A protein has these predicted regions:
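Aromatic-rich carbohydrate-recognition surfaces in CAZymes
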Residues: 1-30, 54, 168, 172, ...
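Specific register positions within alpha-helical solenoid repeats of the TPR/Sel1-like families, i.e.
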Residues: 3-6, 62, 69, 111-114, ...
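Residues in the short coil linking paired helices within alpha-helical repeat scaffolds
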Residues: 7, 73-74, 164
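Extended ligand-binding clefts on enzyme/binding-domain cores
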Residues: 12-62, 67-153
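CBM-like carbohydrate-recognition segments
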Residues: 115-125, 140-151, 157-202
Length: 202
């Protein structure tokens, strides 16, 4: 919103929420740098961190830091937390619950800007065969024939983030097969049967 409209009033209005949410999240950061996935209803933390979630958090922390700087608030602990999280995502995959079958763990570190440039392109290339069905898109899970619009389009953005425009356009083009006549996207499809999954969900 800020980058598009330069609406400082909205930025100031949202600041207390951004501040409190960021502090809440960083309270779940572990000594290695990973951030625990959630808290239970009684406020005790879960026992594991997720790579996809932590990648998204890393991007959100950078945005929160940018908001703080724009409003003149110093938050060195946020910058330290973001740096620690960035490092553990890039260097210590064992810090996260094993979710290797899921496509989001494959491309989210690239999508969220943690793994960039040639290293990011290599990461996308490395497991592309496991998750890509030519002409359709990206499997949600590597050993299941479920193609989803969300994973396909997110992975397209990840390709764009590392300069692979051709790969991004190819994936986005495939995703159009999941659009209905009203221009809405089906959540996913099972191939080769071409059955929408979950049934009827858009």
């Amino acid at each position: 919103h800020w980058l598009t409209y330069r609406d400082r009033g909205t930025l100031e209005e949202l600041w207390p929420m951004v501040r409190d949410a960021t502090d809440f999240v960083l309270a779940l950061q572990q000594p290695r740098g990973e951030i625990i996935w959630a808290r239970h209803a009684d406020s005790t933390p879960f026992t594991f961190a997720l790579l996809t979630g932590s990648s998204s958090i890393c991007h959100s922390l950078r945005c929160a830091i940018a908001v703080a700087r724009e409003l003149g608030h110093e938050r060195p602990n946020w910058e330290l937390g973001a740096a620690r999280l960035d490092r553990v995502i890039r260097e210590d995959p064992d810090a996260f619950a094993p979710k290797h079958r899921w496509a989001m763990d494959w491309y989210y570190p690239v999508l969220c800007g943690v793994i960039r440039g040639e290293t990011g392109r290599e990461r996308l290339d490395h497991r592309s065969e496991a998750f890509t069905i030519d002409g359709w898109g990206i499997r949600c899970v590597s050993d299941r024939p479920w193609i989803t619009a969300a994973e396909t389009c997110e992975c397209a953005i990840a390709h764009l983030a590392v300069g692979d425009r051709a790969g991004a356009l190819r994936l986005f083009g495939w995703a159009q097969r999941l659009r209905d006549p009203n221009e809405r996207y089906w959540t996913g499809i099972v191939v080769p049967e071409e059955v929408n999954f979950p049934g009827g969900e858009q």
